[in-house]
């Protein structure tokens, strides 16, 4: 029969195995039983068993610490209105800062501030915001192609930009009527008729410029074929040829130059330009009178 002394070690091992684990003793070392003693223990097996026991027995959060809510801003919570003030006095006088005075004429245009010769007045008719239908209908006819063909380049350029400004005026008048809310049966008849007249003039200007371009292109082609004209940009543009044809003088017959002009002689008519004394005039050569009788000299007194 076994003694009580031999049974004490075995009982202590059984009690140690059945004892409830605590958080203080369970994390210290792994449990040693007779089965673990019988197995060949290694360092890797011991570390794995310890890790599994820590995971199973730990009931706390993995990172159980206070969460940081600060953003490390020392000026957090300070208000620009409700603040305690600066820490130290600054070099600023205690005088009150002058307050700006509200101008009653803010946003209003005065006559003395307006330039009567400003360029933007050109976009309005007689400096009026909305022209009347009578003012819009007071215009002439459009320019024709025949009239514009004799104009210079400067005149065509000036007329083109005048048409552009007129179209801008018409568009401004139409847009202003729509913005103000002027409603009529057909308020844009006069403006549209004026715009059509301007468009016809601009079409005529384009037609004249197209004709001039075609004429210039034809002249350029002829100049390229002319050996006396140089279009390369180097040297003189026009170089006349040095060969001149000699005039054939054998076909011409020299005739004496008359001292005075003569007219064909007729019966009873003397030569024109020939002067003769009064005594050498033949009375028979003088023209007859209306009676048909020859005129004779009157008897001279002795």
UniProtKB/Swiss-Prot annotation:
Superkingdom in the source lineage: Eukaryota
InterPro entries reported in the protein's UniProt record: MRP-L47_sf, Ribosomal_uL29_mit
Gene3D superfamilies on file: 6.10.330.20
GO molecular function, one term: structural constituent of ribosome
Localization terms from the record: Mitochondrion
Gene Ontology BP terms: mitochondrial translation
Region Disordered, annotated ranges: 255-302
Keyword Magnesium assigned: no
Gene Ontology cellular-component terms listed: mitochondrial large ribosomal subunit
Keyword Aminoacyl-tRNA synthetase attached: no
Keyword annotations from UniProtKB, A to Z: Mitochondrion, Ribonucleoprotein, Ribosomal protein, Transit peptide
Transit peptide: 1-38
Family that this chain belongs to: Belongs to the universal ribosomal protein uL29 family.
Summary of subunit composition and partner proteins: Component of the mitochondrial large ribosomal subunit. Mature mitochondrial ribosomes consist of a small (37S) and a large (54S) subunit. The 37S subunit contains at least 33 different proteins and 1 molecule of RNA (15S). The 54S subunit contains at least 45 different proteins and 1 molecule of RNA (21S).
Cross-referenced PANTHER family: LARGE RIBOSOMAL SUBUNIT PROTEIN UL29M, RIBOSOMAL PROTEIN L47, MITOCHONDRIAL-RELATED
UniProt name for this protein: Large ribosomal subunit protein uL29m
């Amino acid at each position: 029969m076994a003694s009580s002394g031999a049974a004490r070690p075995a009982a202590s091992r059984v009690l140690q195995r059945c004892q409830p684990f605590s958080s203080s003793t369970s994390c210290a070392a792994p449990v040693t039983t007779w089965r673990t003693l019988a197995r060949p223990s290694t360092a890797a097996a011991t570390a794995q068993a310890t890790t599994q026991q820590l995971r199973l027995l730990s009931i706390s959060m993995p990172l159980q610490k206070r969460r940081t809510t600060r953003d490390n801003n020392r000026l957090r919570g300070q208000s620009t209105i409700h603040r305690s003030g600066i820490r130290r006095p600054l070099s600023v006088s205690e005088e009150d800062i002058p307050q700006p005075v509200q101008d009653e004429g803010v946003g209003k245009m005065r006559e003395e501030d307006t330039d009567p010769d400003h360029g933007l007045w050109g976009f309005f008719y007689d400096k009026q915001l909305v022209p009347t239908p009578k003012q819009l209908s007071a215009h002439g006819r459009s320019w024709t192609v025949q009239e514009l063909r004799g104009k210079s380049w400067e005149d065509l350029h000036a007329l083109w930009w005048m048409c552009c400004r007129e179209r801008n005026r018409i568009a401004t008048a139409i847009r202003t009527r729509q913005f103000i809310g002027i409603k009529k049966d057909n308020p844009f008849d006069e403006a549209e008729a004026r715009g059509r007249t301007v468009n016809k003039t601009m079409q005529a200007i384009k037609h004249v410029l197209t004709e001039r371009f075609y004429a210039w292109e034809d002249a350029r082609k002829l100049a390229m074929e002319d050996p006396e004209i140089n279009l390369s940009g180097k040297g003189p543009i026009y170089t006349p040829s040095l060969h001149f044809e000699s005039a054939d003088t054998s076909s011409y017959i020299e005739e004496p130059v008359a001292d005075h002009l003569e007219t064909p002689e007729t019966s009873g008519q003397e030569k024109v330009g020939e002067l003769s004394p009064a005594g050498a005039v033949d009375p028979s050569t003088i023209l007859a009178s209306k009676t048909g009788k020859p005129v004779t000299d009157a008897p001279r007194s002795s």
